[in-house]
Amino acid sequence: MIAPEKLLETARTLEPRLVEWRRTLHRHPEVGFDLPETKALVKKALTEMGYTPQDCGKCGVLALAGGKKPGKTILLRGDMDALPIQEESGEEFASEVPGRMHGCGHDMHTAMMLGAAKLLKEHEDEIEGTIKLEFQPAEEIFQGSLDMLKNGLLEAPKVDAAVMFHVLAGMPLPAGMVLVPGGDRKSVV
């Protein structure tokens, strides 16, 4: 089992890289299944960390951490696609692509997934079971997960449980708070 203190210590060192990934993705938003730059960034980062990323479906990416000790397989999912709307934020890292922007946080989700991948790789020998990382396209058009499911997302290794996350911008919550609703949740996206 990975000690929380070790994870936090490593996580604190990743902040500059997370900001860099997020801002790069934010400047170059891509929509639907048409994510060549985003997918290339994800696969390059994963490869540099020591993963062997695998394509899944039209544009999804998978990577495995752990697997050296017995245990369950947990899927960790993050989405990568942007929205077909014009950004008017004026931020220094605003979209450079007319009519497209990361207005729903998927740039952050992708950066956070890469951060999780880095943490997991650095503590891989401590993982009981396997963590399957899913970088999903086309969430905004409700097609990305369906495509990945049809192309073996939940197999090899078989997934026992899945977790996804989403930022809640504008919510009156303190920084660092995580909300986890009770009970089972299921989704098609």
Put a short name on every predicted segment.
Residues 2-102, 111-127:
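Acidic/His- and Gly-rich active-site-bordering loop/insert found
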Residues 62, 83-84, 90-101, 108, ...:
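Histidine/acidic-residue-rich, glycine-tolerant segments that coordinate divalent metal ions
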